[in-house]
Amino acid sequence: MKVLGISGSLRKDSHNTSLLRAAGELLPPGAELDLVGIGDLPLYDEDADTDPAPDAVARFRDAVASADAIVVSTPEYNASIPGPLKNAIDWASRPFEANPFRGKPVLVVGASTGLFGAVWAQAEIRKVLDHIGANVLDTELPVGQAHEAVAHGLRDAGISAELERQLAVLVAMTRDAEAVGHRSHRERERVAA
């Protein structure tokens, strides 16, 4: 099973990228994590959203489309989503009918140097992903004081255990979704209506 890791931070020594690397080591057997960068994506501009798409955009869309599941790790800037992460989601989600996030199981986690571990950014990113039809786990993993918790590997046993548990749920949810066909709860509601 291919799990795609998307870090919302562009920093070279990003705590969120470190958290994703730790997630890769905690995945259940049979699942592996591939990281994709978002730093080379241009700012979203509908005039530039052409066919064919810009190379960096096409690579990112392909990475999302080919993944079985996704883990997004986000920092929090000014109590919200970092611009590069929102930009990446905007690029991938258009055109809406070809949106590779639709029905895709997604786990959102976050790390910040503050006490609250990017909880507001996690809530916002879950809202955005839910809106575009991703099948987002209704959990959060706030990793506060990330400069101590994940700067040199994940050192907090409680956070590590919770991340491992959430990853197991993501993998199980992905296997279940593959068994019944990828559908987000929004799509299931539309079908039921």
Where are these regions (language model features)?
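N-terminal beta1-alpha1 ligand-phosphate binding loop
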Residues: 1-30
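A general structural signal for well-ordered alpha-helical segments in protein cores
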Residues: 3, 16, 20, 57, ...
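Glycine-rich phosphate/pyrophosphate-binding loop and the adjoining helix
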Residues: 4, 135-193
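A generic structural motif
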Residues: 27-34, 134
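N-terminal beta-loop-helix "entrance" segment that forms/cooperates
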Residues: 38-54, 149-152
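Helix-loop-strand module that forms the ligand-binding subsite of alpha/beta enzymes
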Residues: 52-132
